[in-house]
Amino acid sequence: MHVFAAVFHLRLLSRSLKGKRGIVKSILARARNNFNVAAAEVDLQDVHGEAVLGFVTVSGSRVEARKTLEKLEERLVEERPDVDVVSVDIEEV
């Protein structure tokens, strides 16, 4: 069993914490539903223009686990023009 974690640092086109909350909740819900990952906002909760999101996946295959998180990043870039991906760190736990 292989556990991989990813930390996404995002820049958001949001002018308020309420707007940020809507964007973050949408991203987390889609990730959970479409990629079967655990997901949470892990840092910068009080900063309206940025977010740090954490995702974790478990798989029997190291390659499959990493690929899941990489596809999540690709989908985020494709579907969310209001979000800029500043950095992504994927590692095996």
Predicted regions: what they are:
Residues 57-93:
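C-terminal structural segments of small proteins and small subunits
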Residues 20:
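C-terminal binding/interaction regions
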Residues 1-5, 48-50:
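A general secondary-structure signal for short beta-strands and their flanking turns/coil
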